[in-house]
Amino acid sequence: ELLVSKLFHDKNYFEFYITSDDVKSLKPHPMPFLKAIKLSGIKITNSIVFEDSNPGLKSACSANLPTICVKSNLPIIYDKDIPLKCLVDTIGDVKHLTNIIKGPQLNRDYIDYEYLNDFINNYQ
């Protein structure tokens, strides 16, 4: 909680966040994501995960959640058993363009609502 508080300067950008104290099983187990879905009250079919680590990717995929892998600044060799359907170098915005390394192509130069909606609907 202290890290989140420091990173966001005590501003309340999130309704909740989940730490290792909140779940019995940590990533790569799907429990952290499933708990987030439950607490949020949204449907699992309206969810999407952005991840940058092997444990997080395994966790999201085990929870059967549409997952976009965003490359980290840290050198990571992705596990071959993780079914990566989308890998990008950055989420992007109008000043920082997104490059799709693997996955559906963009209609714009960054990930937008339309892309996310199509990705969720075509995930299975």
Predicted regions and their residues:
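Asp-based, Mg2+/Mn2+-dependent phosphohydrolase catalytic module
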Residues: 1-124
